[in-house]
Amino acid sequence: TIIIFCGGILVGSLLENAQLKDAKQITLNEKVNLQSLQLQQSYMESGLADCKTLNKILETNIDELTKKMGIVIDYEKQSFFNEDEFNLQLRDYFLTEIQFLLTSQEIDKTCAKDSIKVIYFYDESAADTQGQILDYLKKVFGSEVLVFSFNSGFNQEPMINVLLTSYKIEKFPAVVVDDQVFQGHTSVEVLMKTICNEINGIKGEMPKKCQTLFKNYK
């Protein structure tokens, strides 16, 4: 029994080390992607790069970062050891996401605005369905909407609290659509209307998908 128990600990430890290595590789990849994007932004400011291409790269990198973070979170849930290291991975992820957010805002200053930036602050409430609503809206609007999600209860990273303070967030879940702040659960209808109006402001016309969606939710 002791041998089996020790063997189980060894296997678990080896598995966790492998998972941690994977997590480190994930964050390294995204850091490299971010550095590449920032260099392309600087290149673009010299007038030699294409805004459309840059925005496409930004969207792809954010989507990949979100997918890969799901893997890191799964690893954390399965882990019994090295909690501090996993928390460092989470910090690294959130900092990288914040850098992507700031980079996207800088790109908007140089290029014609290409997408609506949505910031989602969530807590650990099992009853929170705001994330599902945002997933749905992301599927509907595609590249026209970029979503940045932050765990409001992750106190290990001070920058999250800086964002919460800057947007004066006091109730969760909270959603920021460009500069409009919604605190507490916000319905799909309200967010959809807000996003559609923002897109209308960018393109000068209401997208057909918005007209169809408005009819469905009347």
Regions found by a protein language model. Give the residues of each.
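Typically the conserved alpha-helix immediately C-terminal to a functionally engaged Cys/Sec
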Residues: 125-141
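Short, intrinsically disordered low-complexity segments
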Residues: 156-172
